[in-house]
C-alpha cells in the first residue's frame, strides 16, 4: 500500500480553506497558530491521506501545498 501525505508550506498558506473543503478524507484542518505573514495555516492530521491531490489542485497559492507519495519496496507507487 502506498503512503501519501500532504506537505504544507506554512509561510505560503493564506488560510483560504479550499484544500480543507476539497479533501475527501478530511485529513486537513486549520491551525490555531499564525504564520509570519499573519495568516492561520492548514495542518495535516498525520494519517489518512489517499494521495488524490485535490488539495494541491484547488490551492490558489503556488508552492503552498504538495502531495508526496512514497514508493513501495519494489519502486512502484501502486500498493
UniProtKB/Swiss-Prot annotation:
Catalytic class of the enzyme: oxidoreductase
Catalytic activity, reaction form: 3-methyl-2-oxobutanoate + 2 oxidized [2Fe-2S]-[ferredoxin] + CoA = 2-methylpropanoyl-CoA + 2 reduced [2Fe-2S]-[ferredoxin] + CO2 + H(+)
InterPro entries (UniProt xref): 4Fe4S_Fe-S-bd (IPR017896), 4Fe4S_Fe_S_CS (IPR017900)
Cofactor note (record): Binds 2 [4Fe-4S] clusters.
Pfam families: Fer4_7 (PF12838)
Sites where the protein binds [4Fe-4S] cluster 2: 23, 49, 52, 55
pH dependence text: Optimum pH is 9.7.
Gene3D superfamilies noted in UniProt: 3.30.70.20
The keyword Iron-sulfur is assigned to this record: yes
PROSITE patterns from the UniProt entry: 4FE4S_FER_1, 4FE4S_FER_2
Name of this protein: Ketoisovalerate oxidoreductase subunit VorC
Upper lineage: Archaea, Methanobacteriati, Methanobacteriota, Methanomada group, Methanobacteria
